[in-house]
Amino acid sequence: MVRKLILFTAVISFFQACNDEPVDNSVFVEEQEEQEIEEWDSGTFKDKDGNLFFTGGDCDQGSPDYIVGEFVLEDLQISTTLPIQFDLSEFLPPIDSQGTMGSCSSWAISYYMKSMQEGIEDGFTTRLSPAYTYNQISQGFCGGTALEETLDILKEQGVSSWIDFPYSDADCTTQPNETVKESASDNKISDYKSLSGENMVNEMKTLLTQQIPIMIGATLSEQFGRPDSFGDAAYREHAVNYERTACHAMLVVGYDNLHNAFKVVNSWGVEWGNAG
């Protein structure tokens, strides 16, 4: 059904692309420097374990600045009684992987965000299809897509169930037929907006406590997902090398003041991070 809640997007860094899951076990070594540069130029990077990540295209490298979208959230009343921790993960569909296609926007929005919204409203787990939006946008290209394109489809058409239009990382060409599109109309969003950026941390915490998940487009480097000194897969901005970055869409589903961190759900499978 159409959600009366508005989807809010916190776009940390403008991008038209996204990363794919790690697919091999190569290792960063000094002797392979020339190969690494070639891989980076083609849109890849590796984590400390040698897992290779692919991106769907170019992004605004070197800019960690927040970029506000066309429609901005206004007049949000920031809660003065925010809990120390809050987590919407219980409403998520099963953690899954986008595979080797640049479909992170559709995974974050169509699969995680919209499935979560419907699950909160209906009281049971719903599994919607990232392929419904991704295939319509990519049209067989299988590269990265913009957040706004995905959100516009959810606003205009909705999104179908996984059963009606299953996802395969070997197919970004097949298009939903009219029957599938008709079923998708039950799962629309009413609107989406950007955060103002003026008090973003508390804006995000307030929205999460109102059961409103937040889309982000994040600038990442090789440190993303690496365990920190506490054993957590936390991402510390001060450690980011903005000369070697990639861009990726994810969904913010919680926060923890004890760790001074927000919790995101990713589309690289349960092996990544803290079980996904």
Could you say what each language-model-derived stretch is?
Residues 11-12, 98, 166:
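Processing junctions and N-termini across compartments
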Residues 124-139, 170-173:
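Acidic helix-start/capping segments at beta-turn-to-alpha-helix junctions
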Residues 114, 139-265, 270-276:
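Predominantly the structural core of cysteine protease catalytic domains
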Residues 80-84, 127, 210:
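A short, polar/charged loop/turn motif at coil->beta-strand junctions and beta-hairpin connectors
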Residues 86-97, 130-137, 184:
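Acidic/histidine-rich, surface-exposed loop or edge segments in extracytoplasmic proteins
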Residues 1-28:
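Bacterial Sec-dependent N-terminal signal peptides
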Residues 4-5, 85, 126-130, 147-148, ...:
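Alpha-helix initiation and N-capping motif
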Residues 18-102, 106-110, 116-121, 142-151, ...:
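Structured alpha-helical subdomains that flank or immediately precede key functional sites
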